[in-house]
Amino acid sequence: MQALVNRLWYDRQAGVHWLLVLLLLPLSGLFYLLTSLRRQLFRLGLKASARLDVPVIVVGNITVGGSGKTPTVIYLIELLRRNGYRPGVISRGYGVEFSGCKRVIAGMPANEVGDEPAMIVARTQVPMVIGSDRVAAGKALMDWQAVDVIISDDGLQHYRLKRDIEILVLDGKRRFGNGLLLPAGPLREGRWRQGRVDFTLVNGEGSGPEEFEMALAPGNWRSVADGQVVTANVDKSHESVAIAGIGNPQRFFDTLSEIGVQPSGQHAFDDHQAYSLEAIETVAAGRGVLMTEKDAVKCREFAKSNWWYLPVDAKIAPEFEQQLLTLLKRRENVQQGN
């Protein structure tokens, strides 16, 4: 199913699949009307929005699927800490059923808090609260920890929470796909939305004017079971299979090729896939397993000794850092009435 959707949205040579796109256009029109109405209700104050007592940085995208938001959030946490801030993070907690707000503590299973929150906290130990209501999550976070700036992960379309800085993350290769709104295309909002954000980060090739190029730099292979750095050659003459349950699995497979790792097979799972030992062993068929860090947080409890994950770090131009920090200070002064 995911392969078909990718062809519909991103393959310009999809041929007959464009017939299906045409059939979906009326639904995209309805989606446009509903989302436009919702935005206008917030803009006119007919739907309530709220501002928190600390600056809010929203990281998001306008397309469905992976673009590099999670590495960007981790990058921002580290950047803010280096510059004397005490950041916290709020997120939805995709795929997890709970009411109200929930604190994310390092070591909590991904099936209780979501794979991306589990990964962010495991990597950074940042204070984090998840909840469908970002305003409530932000207030719960401030009640819990003395944070002085909040990062809202994947919160671009959550207009109930007023924000001070918006950062759009784009996949450089896919960009806006066929340029159509859901479900005929991958867009949550029109391309016009890019012009309203403060910064656009382009993950990979193809950054344009007023865009900052971002690269995901692979780190050292680590054991899924205990997180220890692996010094041995994980490829072992093609005796491994690569798996990925992320928004854009091909990006992970391409990264392996770029660093000279050539597994004997690869398998793309759905984004936010709930893994089991049986499911992975069926794909692995006795071979070692290579996976992303996001996959690893869901497999740690039953991982085997020959399962490894590859962490990545976002690398962004220094000009972005300086412009972001300058804008943050300016927005802080406005909020404090200086």
UniProtKB/Swiss-Prot annotation:
Recorded GO CC terms: plasma membrane
GO molecular function term, any single one: ATP binding
Enzyme class: transferase
Pfam families listed in its UniProt record: LpxK
Keyword field contains Ion transport: no
EC number: 2.7.1.130
GO BP annotations listed: lipid A biosynthetic process; lipopolysaccharide core region biosynthetic process
Chain sites annotated for binding ATP: T63, V64, G65, G66, S67, G68, K69, T70
Alphabetically ordered keywords of this record: ATP-binding, Kinase, Lipid A biosynthesis, Lipid biosynthesis, Lipid metabolism, Nucleotide-binding, Transferase
Catalysed reactions, as listed in the record: a lipid A disaccharide + ATP = a lipid IVA + ADP + H(+)
Pathway named in the protein's UniProt entry: Glycolipid biosynthesis; lipid IV(A) biosynthesis; lipid IV(A) from (3R)-3-hydroxytetradecanoyl-[acyl-carrier-protein] and UDP-N-acetyl-alpha-D-glucosamine: step 6/6
Superkingdom of the source species: Bacteria
Function recorded in the entry: Transfers the gamma-phosphate of ATP to the 4'-position of a tetraacyldisaccharide 1-phosphate intermediate (termed DS-1-P) to form tetraacyldisaccharide 1,4'-bis-phosphate (lipid IVA).
Family from the record: Belongs to the LpxK family.
Protein's UniProt name: Tetraacyldisaccharide 4'-kinase
Originating organism: Shewanella loihica (strain ATCC BAA-1088 / PV-4)
Encoding gene (name): lpxK
